[in-house]
Amino acid sequence: MKPFSPEVSPDPCPATAAHLLRTYTLFLTLLELAQGCRGSMVSNRPFITVWNADTHWCLKDHGVDVDVSVFDVVANKEQNFQGPNMTIFYREELGTYPYYTPTGEPVFGGLPQNASLVTHLAHAFQDIKAAMPEPDFSGLAVIDWEAWRPRWAFNWDSKDIYQQRSMELVRAEHPDWPETLVEAEAQGQFQEAAEAWMAGTLQLGQVLRPRGLWGYYGFPDCYNYDFLSPNYTGQCSLSIHDQNDQLGWLWNQSYALYPSIYLPAALMGTGKSQMYVRYRVQEAFRLALVSRDPHVPIMPYVQIFYEKTDYLLPLEELEHSLGESAAQGAAGAVLWISSEKTSTKESCQAIKAYMDSTLGPFILNVTSAALLCSEALCSGRGRCVRHPSYPEALLTLSPASFSIEPTHDGRPLSLKGTLSLKDRAQMAMKFKCRCYRGWSGEWCKKQDM
């Protein structure tokens, strides 16, 4: 682990960072040409759920075995935050990410335009190789940088310090400039540097581990938090659409998009969760369709608790989060639990009971429905996507045709049943196909040349 230090190592040459990024981009392009379609853990699979939690501590510290392997959940060995299927980098674990502490102290320069990108990439090079020792890593590679956002306009409330300190830098250099010019220059400097840092880090990861699904947690965002509005629809505002459109470089560079659909506590009992989630996931698809790769996997981040509470989501809220994501044709979802939730025996027992009674059966239901729909409608070569005429339709199995039964000998839950003609007709009416890369046509039967 690197020592905590606010010091910044000056770049050896002002042009080095730009040259380094151009070199990485060239390497990445050559790799893509050589490999063609990147294979990954989500390739040609309708819907997967990834367990991104360190619940192994429940067994190690409290004797509570949260056995997620019995479900259709891809979990790392020992269920920790880094492994062959899933690696997440927090700010202390990848390079020398610049930010301000809650007391306003700069770390590694504080601002991206006041920090050394070359030093960061050199450290990140070693961090990536250490966290992902296998060159053919093909799992999810998530960067969790939340201190600042790459668009100036998105840095409000506690993030306003990045605007204020950016303007201070410009004032110090140009004390005679009017405030309008100071802010315009500060905005330009900040956004240019933010792009260099975020794009450069992605490019480095993609060069070192080209099969990994590299992307940033929480991007894109819809900022649709006005739950108390009596006319709340959940839709992203036009101004948010415009700002997200300016981040084309980020969507073009990402190998996966990881929007957050954590449910804030304010949504409890409001009946607005599905609207909230729907437009956050839709925004990811909107941006993916105009990016360099319209097939980029969408993998929303889901919590099983209401955010910052100890209240587990009821089944209907799982339908509004996991279920909504699957119905829109997401490649899967990442289930995350904070380490605080695994720190007590009581919390671990609650998680285990929830997994056994609610979450596990629901995951098996949704993933099985997605697979059966893919085979029935899309020739097994695409994902079922909800038809706009049926905005409430979910990919779940009919209880008249299927049953999910627990076993008593430690083996996984069992699914029994077959699709009836009525089930197939309902799927065909409410869903259509989004074909995997290389396939097209209404039923994904045509192989692209």
Swiss-Prot record:
Gene Ontology MF terms in the entry: chondroitin hydrolase activity; hyalurononglucosaminidase activity
Output the GO biological process annotations, alphabetical, semicolon-separated: carbohydrate metabolic process; cartilage development; cellular response to fibroblast growth factor stimulus; cellular response to interleukin-1; cellular response to pH; cellular response to platelet-derived growth factor stimulus; cellular response to tumor necrosis factor; cellular response to UV-B
Question: Would you say which domain of life the source belongs to?
Answer: Eukaryota
Which cysteine residues pair off into disulfide bonds? Answer: 58-348, 222-236, 373-384, 378-433, 435-444
Domain EGF-like, first and last residues per copy: 433-444
Q: What is its main location?
A: secreted
EC number, as in UniProt: 3.2.1.35
Show the Pfam families listed in the entry: Glyco_hydro_56
Chemical reaction(s) catalysed:
Random hydrolysis of (1->4)-linkages between N-acetyl-beta-D-glucosamine and D-glucuronate residues in hyaluronate
Question: Does this UniProt record's set of keywords contain Hydrolase?
Answer: yes
Q: Which residues form the active site?
A: 146
Keywords assigned: Disulfide bond, EGF-like domain, Glycoprotein, Glycosidase, Hydrolase, Lysosome, Secreted, Signal
Where is this chain glycosylated?
Answer: 85, 114, 231, 252, 365
Q: Which SUPFAM superfamilies match?
A: (Trans)glycosidases (SSF51445)
**Location within or outside the cell:** Secreted; Lysosome
GO CC annotations?
Answer: cytoplasmic vesicle; extracellular space; hyaluranon cable; lysosome
Spell out the InterPro entries in the cross-references: Aldolase_TIM, Glycoside_hydrolase_SF, Hyaluronidase
Stretch forming the signal peptide: 1-39
What job does this protein perform?
May have a role in promoting tumor progression. May block the TGFB1-enhanced cell growth. Overexpression of HYAL1 suppressed the growth rate of colon carcinoma cell tumors in an experimental model.
Task: Give the UniProt family note.
Answer: Belongs to the glycosyl hydrolase 56 family.
Q: What is this protein called?
A: Hyaluronidase-1
- Which organism is this protein's natural source? Rattus norvegicus
